[in-house]
C-alpha cells in the first residue's frame, strides 16, 4: 500500500509541476492552495468549481452577444471578459487570463473577427484547464482514499 501511495504522490507532484510549467496555472493557484486545510479539505475544488460555473455563463453570454452579427454589443462583451479575467486571475488560471487580455483588446477596438477567434480560444483553454484540474483533484482523492497525505509541491 505504501508503494501505491508513493506512486500516486509522485504522479501528483509531477502533474502539478507540469500544470505550472505548461502555463496553465500561476502563483495565485499556489496561494489558493495555502488557504485549504483539514477543516476545509475541498476548499480549492469548491472555489475552482464556482470559477468554472462562472466561466460557462460568461462565455455563453459573450457568444450570444457576438452572435448578433452587425449589432454586436462590444461593451457587454468587454464587461463579461473583464469579469472572466478577474475570476481567472483569482484562481491562477494563467492561460485563460492571458487570452482574456487579448479578447478585451479586441473588444476595445471592436474587432469582431478577433473577438470571435479569441472567445473560441478562451473556451478551449477553459475546457482544457477544467479537465486537467479534475484529473488533479481525482489524484488527490486517490491519495487520500489510499490512506496517504497530499504532498506539498514546491514550484
Curated annotation (Swiss-Prot):
The keyword Transport does not apply. It is found in: Cytoplasm, Cytosol; Nucleus. GO terms for biological process: antipodal cell differentiation; cytokinin-activated signaling pathway; embryo sac egg cell differentiation; phosphorelay signal transduction system. Its main location: cytoplasm. The modification N-acetylmethionine is found at residue 1. Pfam families: Hpt (PF01627). SUPFAM superfamilies: Histidine-containing phosphotransfer domain, HPT domain. The modification Phosphohistidine is found at residue 82. One of its GO terms (cellular component) is cytoplasm. One of its GO terms (molecular function) is histidine phosphotransfer kinase activity. Disulfide bonds: none annotated. Two-component system major event consists of a His-to-Asp phosphorelay between a sensor histidine kinase (HK) and a response regulator (RR). In plants, the His-to-Asp phosphorelay involves an additional intermediate named Histidine-containing phosphotransfer protein (HPt). This multistep phosphorelay consists of a His-Asp-His-Asp sequential transfer of a phosphate group between first a His and an Asp of the HK protein, followed by the transfer to a conserved His of the HPt protein and finally the transfer to an Asp in the receiver domain of the RR protein. Induction: By salt, cold and drought stress. InterPro entries: AHP1-5/YPD1, HPT_dom_sf, Sig_transdc_His_kin_Hpt_dom. Residues 40-147 form the HPt domain. Strongly expressed in roots. Detected also in flowers, leaves, siliques and stems. Keywords: Acetylation, Cytokinin signaling pathway, Cytoplasm, Nucleus, Phosphoprotein, Stress response, Two-component regulatory system. Histidine-containing phosphotransfer domain (HPt) contains an active histidine that mediates the phosphotransfer. Functions as a two-component phosphorelay mediators between cytokinin sensor histidine kinases and response regulator (B-type ARRs). Plays an important role in propagating cytokinin signal transduction through the multistep His-to-Asp phosphorelay. Interacts with the B-type response regulators ARR1, ARR2 and ARR9. Binds to ETR1, AHK2, AHK3, AHK4, AHK5 and CKI1. This is Histidine-containing phosphotransfer protein 3.
